[in-house]
Amino acid sequence: MREADEQYFETLETQLEAAFDVAERAKERGGDPKPEVEIPTARDMADRVENILGIDGVAERVRELEGQMSREEAALELVEDFVEGTVGDYDSREGKVEGAVRTAVALLTEGVVAAPIEGIDRVELLENDDGTEFINVYYAGPIRSAGGTAQALSVLVADYARALLGIDQYKAREEEIGRYAEEIDLYDKDTGLQYSPKEKETKFIAEHMPIMLDGEATGDEEVSGYRDLERVDSNSPRGGMCLVLAEGIALKAPKIQRYTRNLDEVDWPWLQDLIDGTIGKDEADEGDSAEDANGDDAGEGADDDGGDEADEQAGPPRVEPADKYLRDLIAGRPVFSHPSKSGGFRLRYGRSRNHGFATAGVHPATMHLVDDFLATGTQIKTERPGKAAGVVPVDTIEGPTVRLANGDVRRIDDAEEALAVRNGVEKILDLGEYLVNYGEFVENNHPLAPASYTVEWWEQDLAAAGADVQAMQDSPHIDLADPSAEEAIEWATEYDAPLHPKYTYLWHDVSIEQVCALADAVEDAQVAQADGAYADPEMDGTAGDAHSDDGALVLPRSDAVQQTLEHLLIGHTQDEETITVTDWVPLVRTLGFSRSLERDWTREDLSEHARTYGESESLDAIGVAEDAEREDGQNAIKAINEVAPFQVRERAPTRIGNRMGRPEKSERRDLSPAVHTLSPIGEAGGAQRDVAKATKHADDMSDTPGQVEVEVARRRCPDCGTETHQANCAECSGTTEPVYVCPDCEAEVERDESGRAECGRCETLASPTQYKVLDLQEAYRDALQNVGERETAFEQLKAVKGLTSEEKVPEPMEKGILRAKHDVSAFKDGTVRYDMTDLPVTAVRASELDVSAERLRGLGYTEDIHGDPLTHEDQLVELKVQDIVLSDGAAEHMLQTARFVDDLLEQYYGLERFYEFDDREDLVGELVFGMAPHTSAATVGRVVGFTSAAVGYAHPYFHAAKRRNCFHPDTRLWYEDENDDWEYGTIEELVESRLDDPQEDDFGTLVQELDGDLTVSSLGENGPCRQPVDAVSKHPAPDHLVEVAVGDRTLRVTPDHTMLRAGPDGIEEVPASDLAAGDDLPAYDGGETTTMTARGEASTAATDGAAPTDTVEAVEYVESDVDHVYCLTVADTHRVAVEGTYVGQCDGDEDCVMLLMDGLLNFSKSYLPNQRGGQMDAPLVMSSRIDPSEIDDEAHNMDIMDAYPREFYEATREMKDPTEVEDVMKIAEETLGTDREYTEFRHTHDTANIAAGPDLSAYKTLGSMEDKMDAQLEISRKLRAVVESDVAERIIEYHFLPDLIGNLRAFSRQEVRCLDCGESFRRAPLTGDCRECGGRVNLTVHEGSVNKYIDTAIRVADEFGARDYTKQRLKILERKIESVFENDHNKQSGIADFM
């Protein structure tokens, strides 16, 4: 590590230690669950392992061993330390084995939380039939997240510890061996295994395994043959055991054997038989394997041979257009380009400094000219190389080319100019360049697409042709990026090099016919000087000089010539009779003309190959011909190269289609609804959870106001014996401890070494909670007094209804009072958080961060990226790996949080204020926690500046992980399969049948991306719709699920699963754990399918009229009975209809940040929900240093070059695999483990401001959905690359029609509801009165919600030229709606009706 990097990390750690000292002093004084900071610091992986497991001495020993051996070897070496007692404090033998096994798994998973803590339940000592003892390791489902190698090694570690402790081997009984085989087979059928061993293999392993593999029962199925065994607790498959035996031992036998051979105490000779295939494999299997291997080789060879045929093709090499991103278009989110269509974004290779993975560089002028729908951080669905990307502004690429209302055509390379002219833009002829880095193609395993011919490629071609490019770059008189026309032509002819890209027009976008028509027009053209006189180009040496004002080419105007110039992207002006091109010499020379406008060729002189080149390009990806009469000769590049006196390259051979996805995000993260304190008040606070209201609540007149019964902790002070529910003793201020009581016999139970509290008499788990009546009036009054505040200090104090943590320790209400005062809310762990769309940046300028160069120097930025001293704000400096840039909104929120923290320290803890910020500049240099939600680990970051964009910028290594929320396997849903058939089945069947080649992450999640042919019913902003499924996934199941009862059906999901709840302001998204009885959920009535799913008894109208609602009858936590849960990734809406209810599904979490001192003071594990997954999103450990070798491989694939080599560009012309050019490219992976791993992140493109372009997408600023849709269609009209009728068709087909049909069906099947008592009836009472209370009943679905889009749909179909079939469908539907709502009895008739 460089000295500068070490100094940087030491600076962060010094600040961290100072904050820790203050927080520790505060914790000793307050009423927190623990008297110390609960977020341990980990400088490296060894620290994380120790902190996660809580075993003293592990980190130091791991560091000693890491330098001497591999992690696997270190895990085995640590076994001796546990057995000898030098590491860990275990009295029992089984405790030592358990400590060794957990540490091994933690070490091999680099500190990932789930596997070592939740994947190993316990270790027991049991007896063989001969009286000897053996080790039984009890695995749980989350061991899946450790991966096969760690699973298998955990067994080897247990065996090694057994041998060192002198414990005998496990001697399996015959029935147990048979049980293992039956159980593995049943588990594989029920849940699925990556590798399913043969029956002989399983029995062989079970017979020789020296450790008994056991585990928790999962699933509803039971074995049929080997039941009720003495040493097996359940008749159901044990998921953890099955995973370890099948995916660990059976699959990873070769790896395990490497380590068994080095251990004298352990001998597993039977592994060799397993590896040799003499057990459980037959010749047919081997033949298949050999065939597969040969097939792979043959495929590679075929690929190698195919590259030389490109020149013989009828057209140039092109990637196939792909329209998957267009499927199920969302109303209000524009299409920017149809697939690979001319006029769309032009692919340019490179990486800007604000560019990384899943990002796309777009010119800020383009962002403004598409009516601000694109902003920094806006997600776009894209044709390639990936499926989606976040937009980042890059102004060093080419901007869009537009035609103005007066007919002028110009390229806009300045955002200010774009704003000035956008009201006068008639057509966007070209969207400009689209910057994608090489690593994106590597990550997505996408063949390289032909590159645009750019300056960086041309310079290398010029050098290869013999020019001294370095001398030319050093010359003050030469600008290689922007040469004059005369210079460009001179270089091209002198060096026999391709023409400069500036003067290389898009000849591949025009046909031979168009070129010939343009040539004819040039032949008839004249050159006009500035004074209007026509000049003889041969006589006037200055005419046509791009840098003079005395020459312009005047062409006779015709539609064909105008269209050709527009497609070539040649700037020009025009009047009724002429078209004027100012920079004309390169054009006429490329067309084979002399300066005197003479040529020596005709169409007949062109070769047959040139005249027919590109015949395959007449149709685009959606089958729409741009020019129906064109049949061949679509690409004029061959013809141009035959007539031009120099080489001309294809300027932009690859166009990339895309459309808008999700808008950018920068907002506070609240629980739903937002609360200020994690103190329980039951139902007394009403829907708003209002504490003041709860203090006055009484169930009836005889009750004392404010007396509320809630479930809280049962605790006792160890000093004075006082029993309480608080973390602090009110009598002596000591820290109380939990008291576990058996629910059956009410005896107190002590926890064992593993933390379990099981009653020895009843064999029941004891509980640390109790139901207790709290006096909220007294608690509220005391809390206000303790912090010296009055009720007037805040508008409302909101609390939670109940606690979801294991011990149910309430948070001090004083903290909530101060949060309410400063308008910040508490997350589930007690912290205050802010979410931001995460974007990468590797170099920044002080000027764009709203800080001074002096301030940056104070943070250690002493020199710029070129090594020059940092003296002014415009210098570019390399961003340090843990420095982050906050959005303006985040900065304001941090200021509020800092004021809350200062008040907390002063008024509650009695210490000095810590921050004392006056304005946001004071935030610069302060530490924050950055949370990557899935990892349960916080990374310390430092604020270096601010951006007006609604995103958070950080180094690519300071990256985000994604969380997925899942369904129980038996969850049923409607889906339209790949054959366009509607099916109704379980999500498990849907997912498992499509896991063909899934990717596995560090947490055991299997993800299979789909091509969009699978469609589900969804709920968009304007009602029901159908959406494609982008991916399916399978995840390790949590210990508990949330079961939601709705009518006669139940829905089981993970506790953090996003649910949709109907509220007064429309549909809101909330975690499943936040639902309560009485909540209304949007109901699915079958959509466009022929069968309606079951509906509940209670139904009310959705607030937005888009769907009816069902009422939740009960919500409860239930133990998970499965080993895996499943989910879908639904495009755009991220919502899906399951079990008759619309719910949320997989959605990537943005990175969230929290102020350091807030996390240190207020985070507590005691507040976390008591369920598997409850510890996700929680900073269980914090990393003070990012280790590049430990982060996601995605970041390692990012290229870090300042220029791409010529070999790379040439390879793109052959569409080679990205791995074929890896030898000439440099990616971040190459610097791992060197002293350059934190530096030298070079980029190929700069940009003036990382926040350029609109601050917010127009999607967020426009009002109604109809306004958004009108803007969407208006953009379609302006964009040359968009077929507006196709956009209109898709909106109607995927939004309006499903909405109208669904709402009409809902109207016919609706329930009625009493306006007085709220009772619902499936059929309206004949009297019209409520049968319960006599009140008036009313419809729940009204006419307005049924026909609200019919007029709009018909208007769009007529205005934008939808197909007759679509118009007819709408007319038929309009008649159906009229027939439902028209009163036939009162219909007015004319005399003609009777004639």
Curated annotation (Swiss-Prot):
GO MF annotations in UniProt: DNA binding; DNA-directed DNA polymerase activity; single-stranded DNA 3'-5' DNA exonuclease activity
Source taxon at top rank: Archaea
Enzyme nomenclature, EC number: 2.7.7.7, 3.1.11.1
Bias kind Acidic residues: ranges: 283-312
InterPro entries: Hint_dom_sf, Intein_N, PolC_DP2, PolC_DP2_cat_dom, PolC_DP2_central_dom, PolC_DP2_N
Chain intervals for the UniProt region annotation (Disordered): 279-320, 657-704
SUPFAM superfamilies: Hedgehog/intein (Hint) domain (SSF51294)
HAMAP family on file: DNApol_II_L_arch (MF_00324)
Protein name (database record): DNA polymerase II large subunit
Organism: Haloarcula marismortui (strain ATCC 43049 / DSM 3752 / JCM 8966 / VKM B-1809) (Halobacterium marismortui)
